[in-house]
């Protein structure tokens, strides 16, 4: 405990010295969330990244999030505390998948989940997050949409909007959300009969069908006030975030082992060393950044 408190003090000192800000995703370890200047979902973090006046952004999240921050802040130093903080789903989508889909559906816009690499974002007409995917896709003047890389979010968007969504790659998924099953739903209802189920749209369709609400992590925070007990179908650390914001409500993880290894690759020690040694700096080639920036900025304009 003493070491944790000591690290927190050193991080605060270094933040002032470097004129740095720490942005953290909702899935980060509790102690990392505690030292962050801002904690949020992908959309909230992207918006925050456009309003940062610090010289240095330390991004406690996975690599595609840090890339997005760099794309939106080309003149700032963006650091990711651990290079192993990566997103398996983002890495499933390759440029070839986009080009193949465009051959089949030349008039369909390419909509990419922000959980994608900078390289693939350069081929997108617009990016989306789980918080704004439905609204943005509704606004697009096309009934056929090429969408990647999460097939479960694609399923949810298709169901809500009535549009034809072409998922690329066909089996793109988040391994954490894919873990949730009907058995987990049944167990949750048995263990917590008075609780409602909040489900992330990256979960499997059969789990979505039993949800009381299907929302992004930001949506979970906004709507948690509607009921006193919730079973949370997303990454485990979201329960910490919700419990901190709503101490008088009860939140239960649907699965204790719903853990994103990429998110957990960043510890308090990594954040401290990142600020101390100014590592690891995120770079995005300008020709990729310029194209990807248009897709991200269009998302922010349409949100």
Curated annotation (Swiss-Prot):
HAMAP family: NadA_type2 (MF_00568). Belongs to the quinolinate synthase family. Type 2 subfamily. Iminosuccinate binds at residues 25, 42, 113-115, 130, 200-202, 217. It comes from Pyrococcus furiosus (strain ATCC 43587 / DSM 3638 / JCM 8422 / Vc1). The gene is nadA. Binds 1 [4Fe-4S] cluster per subunit. [4Fe-4S] cluster binds at residues 87, 174, 260. Pathway: Cofactor biosynthesis; NAD(+) biosynthesis; quinolinate from iminoaspartate: step 1/1. Pfam families: NadA. It catalyses: iminosuccinate + dihydroxyacetone phosphate = quinolinate + phosphate + 2 H2O + H(+). This is Quinolinate synthase. It is an enzyme of class 2 (transferase).
């Amino acid at each position: 405990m003493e070491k944790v408190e000591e690290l927190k003090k050193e991080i605060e000192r270094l933040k002032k010295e470097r004129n740095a800000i720490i942005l953290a995703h909702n899935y980060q370890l509790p102690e990392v969330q505690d030292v962050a200047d801002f904690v949020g979902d992908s959309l909230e973090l992207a918006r925050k990244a456009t309003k940062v006046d610090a010289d240095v952004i330390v991004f406690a999240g996975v690599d595609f999030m840090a890339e997005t921050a760099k794309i939106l802040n080309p003149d700032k130093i963006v650091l990711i505390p651990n290079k192993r903080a990566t997103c398996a789903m983002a890495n499933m989508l390759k440029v070839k998948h986009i080009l193949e889909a465009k051959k089949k559906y030349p008039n369909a816009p390419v909509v990419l989940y922000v959980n994608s690499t900078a390289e693939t974002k350069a081929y997108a007409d617009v990016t989306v997050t789980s918080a704004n995917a439905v609204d943005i896709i509704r606004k697009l003047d096309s009934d056929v949409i090429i969408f990647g890389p999460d097939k479960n979010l694609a399923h949810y968007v298709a169901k809500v909007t009535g549009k034809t969504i072409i998922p690329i790659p066909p089996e793109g998924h988040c391994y954490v959300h894919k873990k949730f099953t009907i058995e987990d739903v049944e167990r949750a209802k048995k263990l917590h009969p008075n609780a409602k189920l909040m489900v992330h749209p990256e979960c499997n369709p059969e789990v979505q069908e039993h949800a009381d609400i299907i929302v992004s992590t930001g949506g979970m925070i906004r709507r948690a006030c509607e009921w006193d007990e919730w079973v949370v179908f997303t990454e485990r650390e979201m329960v910490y975030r919700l419990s901190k914001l709503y101490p008088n409500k009860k939140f239960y993880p649907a699965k204790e082992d719903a853990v994103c290894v990429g998110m957990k690759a960043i510890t308090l020690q990594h954040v401290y060393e990142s600020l101390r040694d100014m590592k690891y700096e995120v770079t995005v080639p300008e020709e990729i950044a310029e194209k990807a920036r248009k897709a991200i900025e269009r998302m922010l304009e349409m949100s």
